[in-house]
Amino acid sequence: MTQPTETEKAKIERACRRLVLHSAAANDRQDYAAFAELFSDDGVMRRPSGDPLRGREAIENAYASRPKDRITRHVCSNILIHVDSARTAHGTTYVALYSADASAEPDGHFGRPAAARVLVGEFEDRFELTEAGWRIAERSARFVMHT
């Protein structure tokens, strides 16, 4: 099997990095259908609590059951993508998770007060090239620390 060229590797890294960022944005918008669509058909999501979610429908349903009045912001950094082949890659991302209660009154132009606890965690992702393009094949999310 021929290894990807440096240009091809850069394109794969960019596609996978965009998946990470789009997954955070879709999650924060509470657009769980769009979030699930970023996974492969048989994608697996492992969260810090609960059993693994297998398949897009299970991922979407689990996230859609979250409280609607919870505002979140997943701030992603240190996104490192490693290209394994022309069809697979893996990566890690640091995540700071902020949340707030949507029913709380905004504090002037500063928005709603954030919860006192900030969670810091990691995503470990495995990516694969599908007929629809690059998708998350497997994500393991874990918390490392909190305030």
Regions found by a protein language model. Name each.
Residues M1-A33, E37, D41:
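Short, low-complexity N-terminal intrinsically disordered segments enriched in polar/charged residues
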Residues E6, A10, L53, A114:
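Charge-dense, low-complexity intrinsically disordered segments
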